[in-house]
């Protein structure tokens, strides 16, 4: 598959404005350094993300998933393959009951902390100063001040490499 064909396929999945080539990664990381991604996409729904993952794996195309780009070092040589960024459109919170929330991976920890505090929910204070998103925090078990994500997470919904949602 040539470069134009790949870009066309990515645009079919996520829309014309959400797929780009040669995207400077320094504008997507907190360190503000790094070269360009060969391809950069921002899916706007779980369904788009699933289609994207299926397509990339079926086509044997390298990809990486990022959130807010917090503490992410990108080489000046850039990133080969496709960068999938989950941030702005994956930042919803759903209040399940008095002590349980369901949060999408792109929500910033500081924003979640504020939302939980506004509802009078405690236990997340340790994470509000961590510069990152929920997805990254879960992936690396972020922690501070004696608290860790593993101490407060009940479950996670994830996509496998075939794009299947697993709870």
What are the residue ranges of the model-derived segments?
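FAD-binding subdomain of flavoenzyme oxidoreductases
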Residues: 125-127, 134-167
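Anion-binding (especially nucleotide phosphate/pyrophosphate-binding) glycine-rich loop
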Residues: 3-134
